[in-house]
């Protein structure tokens, strides 16, 4: 059968008729259309000629990747085999995947295949909960990762799960093969109908130039609680919230099936070992760098986000309070990028930062007669730190250092802090020890 979806497109009537009157030749056309994927100029021309609205254009491109195949993985129960490694199933058998870096494009056989294929777009969610594409990467010159909310669009997953005494199978496809194959949660509308594609924000939320929560590259991710995130996102519209449980579930499936493991940190660790604070060992003025000991500098990474400043309060023991929650730790350089790390002398290393040309001093200050050294503090990575990764998955320099975020099929994650689920609450009942989690499928109803 043909997997090319022409619904809503503007083909001439003869080409449309092939889908029902001559499916064999329709498949020939499908194969030709799939060749467009590797020809940017031809793809741009075809999209603008064959599809009308931006949503239709996006679906046109995604459907070029549609293959109807089944990609699966089996994990043994612990009492069968206490291993995090999985066994590939169905069409995933024989496939391989490895994460890339900024300098190495690794082999990932899942790239561009069915549910693993993604399309970067600018867009928004309207008041009815429907995603509206504004610009498409490599199609529209207006597309921007820094000006407009950036998302990754995927074909809707249909999921098959099987549990038995040996373990569990998880299989996904872009086609529903039987009633046992259920649509992913992201794709289910409140009325029960199924969306043809799902949108996942590419970046953690940070403020744009107007102070609006945005999925854009090059900003500092904001620190939110469940409630403060909901309040902030409601300024964008009633259908916005932080990352949902369904978002997380979808990306977890992609990780487990593509890499056939539940030990995700063995593949891409993410930023979970990045909590350093070091005092200046050499004082300078009018600089955009801080000099620290050589051994301490070895723990830092070019591209990482840091703040530089001095304590403005003392702790209960009368010592400088270097808690990152205090503003003084960010006064000289606030969540800026490390641009270079180079030797200063035999014992010390200079760590350069991009502070926008604003120079500072690394001399100590005083609080109530107590000397407060200038310190550099690691912070969650700014968004867009993985923009130069050469593949669909991977970290900038090292995938397993524990100091860097990564992208997983286009979505940047694990930037160095916890991320509460934006549509999930746990209710603790009065006069009871019971707790119940609740997931909301329509953000407009979140309180």
Feature annotation, model-predicted:
Residues 25-31, 35-39, 394-399, 410, ...:
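Beta-strand-rich, repetitive solenoid scaffolds
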Residues 61-63, 69-80, 375, 392, ...:
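C-terminal, surface-exposed recognition/capping segments
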Residues 141, 145-149, 177-313, 318, ...:
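Short aromatic-cysteine micro-motif
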Residues 55-155, 160-162:
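GGW-centered surface loops in extracellular recognition modules
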Residues 16, 307-308, 419-420:
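Hydrophobic beta-strand signal
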Residues 97, 101, 136-139, 146-192, ...:
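Carbohydrate-recognition beta-sandwich/jelly-roll modules
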Residues 1-48:
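Extracellular "spike/adhesin" assembly and maturation modules
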Residues 38, 42-67, 245:
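Glycine-rich, low-complexity segments
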